């Protein structure tokens, strides 16, 4: 079994009062858990992205807002850019296959958007998975985070959701 910590979208544009504790919580997680691989994703909004076209969402369109948190960047062996909620781009799927990764461990921002979207794809693709809830948060606040947790419990099973 080969594990990979997948750090979802811990970027300057997503670090708010609601989410700014995520990098420190990831650091704490890494002090108690070991993973074979650590990768990160970056959400890249642009005029052709679904969020821009369908939601008219214009945030995260500058290099500064798209930049990864410095700590996350320093620990990630690879960074995968995406313009969808899920991290399961062709490049990401090829990486998982090449590295024979079987177990995905998710942390990051937003619990109710990109973490949840990636979890659906991990489940459908047959990966073993865990979500470290104390290392996730939502820019929309605790209510959105908690709502996503309710969905995750029902759809993916409480046994896959880890709290400190």
Regions found by a protein language model. Name each.
Residues 2-4, 31-32, 37, 57-164:
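Active-site-adjacent betaalpha module
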Residues 6-8:
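Short hydrophobic beta-strand that contains or immediately precedes a catalytic carboxylate
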Residues 10-18:
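Short acidic, Gly/Ser-rich segments with clustered Asp/Glu that frequently serve as metal-coordination loops
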Residues 11-12, 45, 137:
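Short, glycine/acidic-enriched loop or turn micro-motifs at the edges of active sites
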Residues 18-33:
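…and closely analogous acidic/polar surface helices at protein-protein or active-site interfaces
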Residues 19-22, 54-59:
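Short glycine-enriched, charge-decorated loop/helix-capping segments at active-site entrances
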Residues 33-48:
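Von Willebrand factor
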Residues 49-53:
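Metal-dependent catalytic neighborhoods of phosphoester/phosphodiester hydrolases
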């Amino acid at each position: 079994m080969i594990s990979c910590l997948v750090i979802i979208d811990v970027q300057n544009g997503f670090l708010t009062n609601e989410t700014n504790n995520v990098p420190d919580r990831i650091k704490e997680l890494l002090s108690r858990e070991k993973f074979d691989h650590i990768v990160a994703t970056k959400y890249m909004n642009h005029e052709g992205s679904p969020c821009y076209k369908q939601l008219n969402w214009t945030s995260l369109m500058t290099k500064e807002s798209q930049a990864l948190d410095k700590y996350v960047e320093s620990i990630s062996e690879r960074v995968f850019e995406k313009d969808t909620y899920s991290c399961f781009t062709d490049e990401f799927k090829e990486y998982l296959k090449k590295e024979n990764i079987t177990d995905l461990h998710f942390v990051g921002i937003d619990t109710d958007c990109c973490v949840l979207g990636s979890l659906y794809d991990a489940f459908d693709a047959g990966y073993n998975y865990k979500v470290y809830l104390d290392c996730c948060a939502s820019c929309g606040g605790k209510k959105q985070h908690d709502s996503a947790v309710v969905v995750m419990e029902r759809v993916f099973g409480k046994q896959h959701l880890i709290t400190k």
